[in-house]
From Swiss-Prot:
Entry function: Involved in the post-transcriptional modification of the uridine at the wobble position (U34) of tRNA(Lys), tRNA(Glu) and tRNA(Gln). Catalyzes the conversion of 2-thiouridine (S2U-RNA) to 2-selenouridine (Se2U-RNA). Acts in a two-step process involving geranylation of 2-thiouridine (S2U) to S-geranyl-2-thiouridine (geS2U) and subsequent selenation of the latter derivative to 2-selenouridine (Se2U) in the tRNA chain.
Keywords annotated in UniProt: Selenium, Transferase
Limits of the Rhodanese domain: 14-137
Active site: C97 (s-selanylcysteine intermediate)
EC assignment: 2.9.1.3
Protein name, as recorded: tRNA 2-selenouridine synthase
């Protein structure tokens, strides 16, 4: 049965988006997983914990015996059915456990006995993780051009349109501001870094890449932070600043934060609950910057937000949101970004409008 041994093999797995049947326990998978992995555990969290305690107290033979006792009969059959279905659905996939140890070998042997030969990652998730970390360190050494600009400048869409662009916010599932959350929960830090490494590897492999195009991000994107090796290189990068007219920016923000988010919430939760989730999302974003706005200004803008939501609910129009969005941009977001940009003015190599429409920076 074929097994993968070298780092080049591991990189090839990530570049090809090879389906990975990850047989670790759910708690391990949630802490960090590869982008194309599905979690079909040999043992659930409780079973894994019990086997771990047994191993410490009685040794490996007793732990192995307990594992076979816990995963037997109907439980084993149910898991075999799931693995078999996954193998048939992903004939070019691969098995993976923590370190390429007993769990993936046991599942591989059981599948072999059932007539399915399926390869495994010899070094397990740990080897793939180390490959991802090393790849990011190496690829981050290439020159970087950052796309900067005030909120609503279309930076993210501009990055997405570049063949050498990597959408950091898309990978983080967060748009990087107080209002940046999406309906997708953010991944663990390790999973985010693995996603980033895989995306950089794929982008680099599919073209003669000489430099990266990234959005000018802070260290944190929601709850995820950029790998230090990449963040350090970004501090040295040149910057192209998009300076679109204020009205164009407002159109983008209206589309992204009001029209699209309202649509996404109602699509996910239904009209009534979706509306409540949408209202809470906007209020939570404004509340997150209450201290910086000051209590009096926050209360004024929150009242305008409530009025805008009432208008939107009764008429469908989002125009009322301009009453709080415009001062929020003019008094908070724009001055903050311009202050940050002034500190790295010597790195700016371009300023000007971008003709793109839609999207959100």
């Amino acid at each position: 049965m074929q097994e993968r041994h070298t780092e080049q093999d591991y990189r090839a797995l990530l570049i090809a988006d090879t389906p990975i049947i990850d047989v670790r326990a759910p708690i391990e998978f949630e802490q960090g997983a590869m982008p194309a992995a599905i979690n079909l555990p040999l043992m659930n969290n409780d079973e894994r914990a019990a086997v771990g305690i047994c191993y410490k107290q009685q040794g490996s033979d007793a732990a192995l015996a307990l594992g076979h006792k816990l995963v037997a009969g109907e439980i084993r059959q149910q898991r075999m059915d799931a693995w078999r279905a996954a193998c048939l659905q992903n004939p070019h996939g691969i098995l993976c456990c923590a370190r390429g140890g007993q769990r993936s070998h046991i599942v591989q042997r059981w599948l072999h006995d059932a007539g399915i030969d399926y390869p495994l990652v010899e070094g397990g998730y740990k080897a793939l993780r180390q490959t991802a970390i090393q790849a990011t360190i190496e690829l981050a050494q290439k020159p970087i051009v950052l796309i900067g600009g005030c909120t609503g400048s279309g930076k993210t869409l501009l990055v997405q349109q570049q063949p050498n662009g990597v959408d950091l916010e898309g990978l983080a599932r967060h748009r990087g501001s107080a209002f940046g959350r999406t309906l997708q929960p953010q991944l663990s830090q390790a999973s985010f870094e693995n996603m980033l490494a895989a995306e950089m590897l794929k982008t680099d492999a599919h073209q003669d890449l000489r430099l990266w195009v990234l959005e000018d991000e802070s260290r944190m994107i929601g709850s995820n932070h950029l790998p230090e090796c990449l963040r350090e290189r970004m501090t040295q990068a040149t910057i192209a600043v998009v300076e679109d007219p204020f009205e164009i920016r407002l159109e983008r923000l209206n589309e992204e934060y009001f029209l699209r988010m309202h649509h996404d919430f109602t699509h996910a939760y239904g009209d009534e609950q979706g509306w409540q989730e949408y209202c809470e999302y906007l209020h939570h974003g404004l509340s997150a910057i209450k201290r910086r706005l000051g209590l009096q200004r926050y209360n004024e803008l929150a009242a305008r937000l409530d009025a805008a939501l009432t208008t939107q609910l009764t008429t469908g129009s989002t125009d009322g949101h301009l009453a709080w969005l415009v001062p929020l941009l003019e008094e908070y977001y724009d001055p903050m970004y311009r202050y940050q940009l002034e500190k790295k003015a010597e790195k700016v190599v371009f300023r000007g409008e971008w003709a793109g429409s839609g999207g959100m920076g």
